[in-house]
A protein has these predicted regions:
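Short, charged beta-turn/beta-strand-edge "cap" motif at the junction between a beta-strand
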Residues: 13-17
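C-terminal terminal-subdomain/extension
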Residues: 66-121
Length: 121
């Protein structure tokens, strides 16, 4: 069973004519573990390794390079591109985010994205 904080290889399809992330890339599972265990749908946030080319947004969360993440370099979680997917789109598990502080920052970024903080509206 996949769990919140796991990093999977995900097929985001072909979005070449848009600014959305596309192709096969890592993503962090952000849906709650009860939903992850019981639903055929999972919620993920795509990652980008282009940390130096991205303009900072309050929905971006830096993911440091750590062995347990399974990533080969630092990345940015793009919470503004949060997406619900069929679990069939998940590839292999790459690693996990074990740092609670990073997951807390990602939760806040998701709240900002959905307008939970009036200062960003």
């Amino acid at each position: 069973m996949c769990k919140r904080g796991d990093i999977y290889s995900v097929d985001f399809g072909n979005n070449h004519d848009s600014h959305k992330q596309s192709g096969i890339r890592p993503a962090i599972v952000v849906s709650n573990n009860k939903a992850n265990a019981n639903s055929p749908v999972i919620t993920v946030v795509p990652l980008s390794s282009r940390v130096w080319k991205r303009r900072y947004l309050p929905t971006h969360v830096f993911i440091p390079f750590k062995k347990e993440s399974g990533l080969d370099r630092p990345s940015i979680a793009l919470a503004e591109q949060v997406e619900a997917l069929d679990k069939k789109c998940l590839g292999e598990k790459i690693g996990e985010i074990s740092d609670e502080t990073v997951m807390e920052k990602l939760t806040i970024a998701l709240q900002i994205q959905i307008g939970a903080y009036s200062e960003y509206n």
